[in-house]
Amino acid sequence: MYDETDSQTLVKEIISQDMNLDPKRYDPKKIKRLISNAKNQCLTSNDLLEKADNNFDKTVAEAYKRYRISLSKNNSLDFDDLLLLPVFLLRQNDIVRDYWHKRFKHILVDEYQDTNRTQYELIKLITAGNTEPTKFLNWQDRSIFVVGDADQSIYSFRAADFRILIGFQEDFKTSINDDTKSSLIKLEENYRSSSNILDAANSLIENNSERIDKVLKATKEKGELLTLLSCDDEISEAEAITNKIKSLNNYNQNPIWKNFAILYRTRAQSRVLEESLVRWRIPYTIFGGLRFYDRREIKDAIAY
């Protein structure tokens, strides 16, 4: 079983040695990512080659082909193959497909908005067996139930496609009752956020044309008003946040720092925030990760 490091090393060897290409021009990390995305979209190297309209895309298709051959020679798979190969098997072998179709009669999928095309194909093949889902009629002793929110799709960089959720009812329309309300259940009560936060979120997301319409309603009171802060750069942003924390604490002799939390989108954003907190001598804890200067790659860079 090839992990991410093994796969990356193999792609690098294919680019620099087998194909005799400059890895600075043809970045192995980028090409490995494109191969992974192709697998998550249920695409073969031939599929990529047919779609290629420039030399770089053709190079990716060729690297994908050689990568697959190398894995096969080593009697190995990567993580993406654990989904892709079962899909190919179920597509090609009616007996196997029929067996697993009969084995699983009730399918439940959580976080359906983050499903990729390969996962979607696997679900379809197991659910409908040898019949196209749109033509499958035998739902008396079978069911498929999915849970998701198209407004919360965050894994598009891994080839997840929220449109799969939006198209669910059309894909499995023969399973839907005449009373469509019984087949689509909207969970619109929100127990986490105040109504001011939800009102702002609703006003933004309603501009998205590709979604299942819903309006979140808070069970909590309105809460504090939202504040929009505009800053020139990340340094001034970090300073503004730190100053706000200090002012809210009223510069107490014994401030209670645990009442504050800073949320940020990516790990790289933590550095300037941490530096500002350190400068103001504000203690902090990073949840779900290490402090910026405690990360191995940062330690290595500083030591160098």
Where are these regions (language model features)?
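A basic/glycine-biased coupling hinge at the interface between accessory DNA-binding modules
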Residues: 1-106, 133-142, 160-162, 182, ...
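Alpha-helical elements of the RecA-like P-loop NTPase motor core of helicases
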Residues: 9, 98, 155, 166, ...
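Residue-level signature of catalytic and energy-coupling elements of molecular machines
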Residues: 11, 35, 78, 110, ...
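Walker B catalytic acidic pair
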Residues: 103, 111-114, 149
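Conserved interdomain hinge at the start of the Helicase C-terminal
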Residues: 236-252
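Core RecA-like ATPase module of SF1/SF2 helicases and allied nucleic-acid translocases
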Residues: 254-304
